[in-house]
Swiss-Prot record:
Full protein name: Quinolinate synthase
Catalytic activity: iminosuccinate + dihydroxyacetone phosphate = quinolinate + phosphate + 2 H2O + H(+)
Cofactor note: Binds 1 [4Fe-4S] cluster per subunit.
Keyword check for 4Fe-4S: yes
UniProt binding sites for [4Fe-4S] cluster: C86, C173, C259
HAMAP family per UniProt: NadA_type2
GO CC term, one of those recorded: cytoplasm
NCBIfam families found in the cross-reference section: nadA, PRK09375.1-2
Length: 302
């Protein structure tokens, strides 16, 4: 099926199923183009609370689809590809959290939304890269258990002055770990007039050399402040920014900064997902109930 026919079939099935497509900023350009709603993790979570459609097709990775299901237990949530997983989310096991709680019984558990529903069920509050600093600042504790991203945790510690206990000790995003100081220096040489926008999942030494440190939603807000940017995050963010601001120049810091899990979602898989109503996302009720409290607390605090 050619692309135009595929898109027409998707639109037809969306109408028949009363479905919407929610997509993350790291999706393939052709998936971004057909999304009803496009955003970062926080924006997608906020949107998921107020969805009118009966079916949500989630063009993102598994933990994002789980969050949508937790917030909409009565709706059908579809993840078009079983391989749309997040390696970092899988690094955090419940036992890591329980062990940290034994060592720091009074410390609140703050979990990045890039975590499983099972892990979120043990959290006091969840955060995204967009609101982590704001939420940790509001917590009445100078010590927090934070996971799974160590780099986001160190950024939060640096900005808030609070002590962050990372769980697991070396949780990370393999895409953002690719970026190095050499990439920063190369970007400065190649694009001398550009500023650097860096995601807080990048290594601290990369963050320290940035002009701004921001979530993907933050990058969108900051972009109009300058006319040329090098983007230190997943490469598809350059497409998203370029569409929003056609008169501003954006360059990927690395062409190989690719999230394989995100790229598992294609137009074909979205079409098949709507056609066959697969793959349905389910979260056990007890886990969903506990995880929902942590997610809703995040939405209230941000």
């Amino acid at each position: 099926m050619d692309r135009e026919k595929l898109i027409a079939e998707i639109e037809k099935l969306k109408e028949e199923r009363n479905a919407i497509i929610m997509a993350h900023n790291y999706q393939l350009p052709e998936v971004q183009d057909i999304a009803d709603f496009l955003g970062d993790s926080l924006e997608l979570a906020r949107k998921a609370v107020n969805v009118d459609a009966e079916v949500i097709v989630f063009a993102g990775v598994d933990f994002m689809a789980e969050t949508a299901k937790i917030l909409n237990p009565e709706k059908t949530v579809l993840l078009p590809a079983k391989t749309a997983t997040c390696a970092m989310a899988n690094m955090l096991q419940v036992e890591h959290i329980l062990e940290a709680k034994r060592r720091y019984p009074n410390a609140p558990v703050v979990l990045y939304v890039n975590s499983s529903a099972e892990a979120k069920a043990h959290a006091d509050v969840t955060v995204t890269s967009a609101n982590a600093v704001k939420i940790v600042e509001k917590l009445d504790s100078n010590v927090v258990i934070f996971g799974p991203d160590k780099n986001l945790g160190s950024y939060v510690a640096r900005v808030t002055g609070k002590r962050v206990i990372p769980v697991p000790p070396d949780g990370h995003c393999y895409v953002h770990r690719k970026f190095t100081v050499e990439d920063v220096e190369r970007a400065r040489r190649r694009y001398p007039n550009a500023k650097l926008m860096v995601h807080p999942e990048c290594e601290p030494e990369v963050q320290e050399r940035a002009d701004i440190i921001a979530s993907t939603g933050g990058m969108i807000r900051h972009a109009p402040e300058w006319n040329e940017w090098v983007v230190f995050t997943e490469r598809e963010m350059v497409y998203r920014l370029s569409r929003l601001y056609p008169n501003i120049k954006f360059y990927p810091a690395r062409e190989d900064a690719v999230c394989v899990g995100m790229k598992a979602i294609t137009l074909e898989s979205i079409y098949e997902s709507l056609r066959d109503m697969k793959y349905r996302v389910e979260v056990p009720e007890e886990i969903a109930k506990k995880a929902k409290r942590a997610i809703e607390r995040m939405l209230e605090m941000s």
